[in-house]
């Protein structure tokens, strides 16, 4: 398995691998209205060039891995727009193509940059539900149903040339198990799995992280694991817990230091000082994090700050 692991060569040479940050935040800054169940996947349909620009900005900021704009891109989601599975898979493949084109553009500017990766985003079934389920994990499907949901996107991402998969924002143990088993049908595929949490020791659905790690230890295609899309202040304790459970590289890409007001549906600074991702870098590294980036509300400036501190 190790010879097909795209992370290994990079992590053998450097302490951390920088991921990118939020896609949606940057698209909104460019005038996109993402008030839609498809979220940033909507832009794959309407204005894909903007996605390439965002990827390029993150590479320029220091990211070594772009995560595709396919988190909410599924045939089930696109069906509401009247697209069939073939059309949906073509759009999912487009998300990889856009990231690859951004990589090509950055390498043309910086031929000495070295290896850059493209990770295909595989968001959870809860993201398709578009009701916050990815932060609760309180949904239930059979293994077959979960795999039927994920299979077309996994195939499209791999066929389009993603270097690995980012199976991310996963809140549900049964879905994690189904997705890990699905990967065995694609033996050359490699993935990281990252989770949303109820607390530092439990998945959002309440499953102990110890049980999740034990499950994934049986799937060598999973080459890193960790956490994403959680509050910045909750990251270190969770990483410390995971570090005691696995020898795999740990992944962390939390939300910005802002806090979300569910009533007004707006983000706000908390107190006089809003913590930044880079403030946490030393403690994340001490807790075993090797793949580090940002999720909601983070920007190329956040990745540049991580780069400056690393």
Swiss-Prot record:
Gene source species: Escherichia coli (strain K12)
Catalyzed chemical reaction(s): S-methyl-L-methionine + L-homocysteine = 2 L-methionine + H(+)
Top enzyme class: transferase
Binding locations of Zn(2+): 229, 295-296
The protein's name in its UniProt record: Homocysteine S-methyltransferase
Hcy-binding domain mapped to chain residues: 1-310
Physiological role: Catalyzes methyl transfer from S-methylmethionine or S-adenosylmethionine (less efficient) to homocysteine, selenohomocysteine and less efficiently selenocysteine.
EC id: 2.1.1.10
Gene Ontology BP term (one): S-methylmethionine metabolic process
Record Pfam families: S-methyl_trans
Cofactors that this protein relies on: Zn(2+)
GO molecular function list: S-adenosylmethionine-homocysteine S-methyltransferase activity; S-methylmethionine-homocysteine S-methyltransferase activity; zinc ion binding
